[in-house]
């Protein structure tokens, strides 16, 4: 039985390692109430070692920037400006020959929204971003 448990633990750790390569970012969300109609949506992204996420403020004609948009067909709320980003770094891209803005290890991104319908019970957004190590996904 002990050998089976050891094998199962080893097999589980191999599965987790494989999952890490396919999903190098984990995003948690929280909400901060500002007023009766305004809220901050806080995205806390944890990136696996060696991976980075591009900022929404990347220069034109460079890597794909982060985008937060309302899902098509959704209503009752709107985005207020661009999201606020914390803990970004500048990184020179040999490919684009430009300095780009990225997150390493952790990203905290805060998007303010305004309710246009106070009875709304769910907020659904697209969080589109490019994560890279030696290749991008």
Question: What annotation goes with each model-predicted range?
Answer:
Residues 18-137:
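Extracellular/lumen-exposed scaffold segments
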Residues 1-23:
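Bacterial Sec-dependent N-terminal signal peptides
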């Amino acid at each position: 039985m002990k050998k089976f448990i050891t094998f199962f633990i080893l097999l589980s750790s191999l599965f987790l390692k494989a999952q890490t390569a396919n999903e190098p970012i984990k995003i948690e969300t929280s909400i901060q109430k500002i007023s009766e109609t305004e809220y901050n949506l806080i995205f806390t992204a944890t990136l696996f070692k060696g991976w980075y996420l591009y900022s929404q403020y990347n220069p034109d004609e460079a890597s794909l920037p982060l985008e937060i948009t309302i899902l098509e067909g959704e209503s009752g709320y709107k985005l207020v400006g661009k999201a606020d980003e914390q803990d970004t770094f500048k990184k020179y891209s040999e490919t684009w020959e430009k300095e780009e803005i990225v997150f390493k290890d952790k990203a905290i991104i805060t998007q303010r929204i305004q309710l246009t319908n106070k009875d709304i019970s769910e907020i659904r957004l697209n969080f589109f971003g490019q994560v890279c190590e030696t290749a991008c996904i």
